[in-house]
């Protein structure tokens, strides 16, 4: 959802896909509609769309709720939506897999799209990210800590991060964008060129 909000602010037409349930799902749809964001959610008959809470009290605490169970019939509906994507379209897969679905769900979706000319972007952690590299995603976006966990070492310099990003590129990723919180971001593009950008200086209000 955060991706969609940023894209809308930048004037990029996009549609939010996924699953919603209960009153919290209806609230999410209303909120996105108020921002002018197009949605095409699949409505589940049972459960509630999860609520995540961040508590700021000296240190930041995250409370992430559990989402509704997603039946196979709903996954098939999602796949039917993805089948409508055309060559050159962009699909962003972000976050964790719902507990009611197999951890191979991202692999299932990318395998279905393989060879259709759809540019896929994946923002996920550890195995979820590594296991989709065989489908050559257009872009992956680990943060520097996640990247370090994947390659099994601490990354302290831009050279360390670049070398680790090249490892994922060799495994199949076309472009690797590494976010580094207050230190900005580093992009290793498919031509092998490195692009580095810092962040505006200011006071952090929250980390979302």
Segments and roles (model prediction):
Residues 112, 158-208:
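Conserved phosphate-binding/catalytic region of the ribokinase-like
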Residues 90-161:
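Conserved beta-alpha-beta core of the PfkB/ribokinase-like small-molecule kinase fold
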Residues 44, 54-87:
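Conserved phosphate-binding/catalytic loop of the ribokinase/pfkB sugar-kinase fold
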Residues 13, 88-89, 138, 174:
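Short acidic/polar active-site loop segments enriched in Thr and Asp
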Residues 13, 17, 25, 34, ...:
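Small-residue (G/A/S/T)-rich helix-start motifs and N-terminal tracts that mark the onset
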Residues 1-48:
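Substrate-binding N-lobe of the ribokinase-like
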